[in-house]
């Protein structure tokens, strides 16, 4: 049985008119009768195409400023009518079959993204007839093709040419899936927007202020990649990306060479890239198991890489390396000749670097593009039975935000290193301690249940690599609950500490710093990372 369906009549009604004229001309050239509405009909007519307006087809005018156009039995009967089963009813009521529906919806997302958008503006951009036609056509995909994406126009024409102006059931089914995805995302955006207009509520909220978090949280992600396995080999996994992901991310990066990215590769590459974005000077970040194990600045990338590698060469083995400048051939050669690396990512990769890395075919080389500003949106974390949603941690202090609470003032060099290692600490798993000196991390203590042990580990790592701690700065992602962390740092040779402050025992901690002759800086900002 031939499951292809010929396309004799198509209804076109689009808000985004990208490519619609060319598509309509291609349909007309293949003998397809065109029905259309409003602005789409006018545009096609202006281009010399023969178009029947839906109002002429139904005998019922558009009304209420265009709110009612296609909600008519002759339209939906033509779309929903089952060929071979509903033909008699359709003939009785003068309903002609519509074989293809080409619809995209009012620009609700763009409208509400405008900071000057009013509720009235939002309401007028809620499409009613469009989603109804889309769902009708998708439901009846056995007989009707629904096209909601402009990037499918060429595909449809190619298949029609290959199948005597017909589309196969497989194609119609795939287009129907895209249609349901389209309307689901659209309705989710509307629900999210209206859900933020109600008062905040919960045990920690008071008053009637609006909430940035909707009553129900709707998010749609598009599958980019199936994976061999997830975090562990017994876990199945896939990688999904946002419908319109921001540039300069692991989600949008171009893979130049190497094996497919694994689940852990993606997570670690994201951690490395987001950390290196914090720095304006040439920087290198090396990540292992989602924690920075080497971070440094330099006069150029080669110097930054050499210094970052020096932080912890053992952990750098099999790590992820991120840069904030174009990867040059000299730096690429230093990496390939020195260590095993899983992923290298940079905003741009020179041809010389590409040629050098090609000698190691399994190394994943990514080019992410330049970043223009901070990443927006929410961070999501699944818990059993729920979802935690929060703003991304975009907080960062400047020099003017710092409060020196010790008797001794930090030197200019200490202050510079304090700001450097504070940025690094933001990306280290809590409890996080970072030792730094001369724009280079010399010891990183991550993920310990007690802060003092993170401090001890940072000192041990520095000592293991022969890095001099004396005169270094220590950053802590959260306050010190006791003085023991300060005592451990002083014993290691730390002379300046930067931390949020805010402990009930702050004075005890400050007193410890003063006893050791250390400078202590409060940021007033915490950077827990779990």
From Swiss-Prot:
Database matches in InterPro entries: AICAR_Tfase_dup_dom_sf (IPR024051), Cytidine_deaminase-like (IPR016193), MGS-like_dom (IPR011607), MGS-like_dom_sf (IPR036914), PurH-like (IPR002695)
Entries under Pfam families matching the protein: AICARFT_IMPCHas, MGS
Cellular component per GO, a single term: cytosol
Highest taxon in the source lineage: Bacteria
Substrates-to-products reaction catalysed: (6R)-10-formyltetrahydrofolate + 5-amino-1-(5-phospho-beta-D-ribosyl)imidazole-4-carboxamide = 5-formamido-1-(5-phospho-D-ribosyl)imidazole-4-carboxamide + (6S)-5,6,7,8-tetrahydrofolate; IMP + H2O = 5-formamido-1-(5-phospho-D-ribosyl)imidazole-4-carboxamide
GO aspect biological process, one term: 'de novo' IMP biosynthetic process
Enzyme Commission numbers on file: 2.1.2.3, 3.5.4.10
Pathway(s) it belongs to: Purine metabolism; IMP biosynthesis via de novo pathway; 5-formamido-1-(5-phospho-D-ribosyl)imidazole-4-carboxamide from 5-amino-1-(5-phospho-D-ribosyl)imidazole-4-carboxamide (10-formyl THF route): step 1/1; Purine metabolism; IMP biosynthesis via de novo pathway; IMP from 5-formamido-1-(5-phospho-D-ribosyl)imidazole-4-carboxamide: step 1/1
UniProt domain MGS-like: residue ranges: 1-148
Alphabetical list of SUPFAM superfamilies matching this protein: Cytidine deaminase-like, Methylglyoxal synthase-like
Metal-binding found in the keyword field: no
This protein's UniProt keywords: Hydrolase, Multifunctional enzyme, Purine biosynthesis, Transferase
Residue stretches spanning the membrane: none
Family annotation (HAMAP family): PurH (MF_00139)
Domain notes per entry: The IMP cyclohydrolase activity resides in the N-terminal region.
Assigned protein family: Belongs to the PurH family.
Protein name (record): Bifunctional purine biosynthesis protein PurH
Organism: Vibrio cholerae serotype O1 (strain ATCC 39541 / Classical Ogawa 395 / O395)
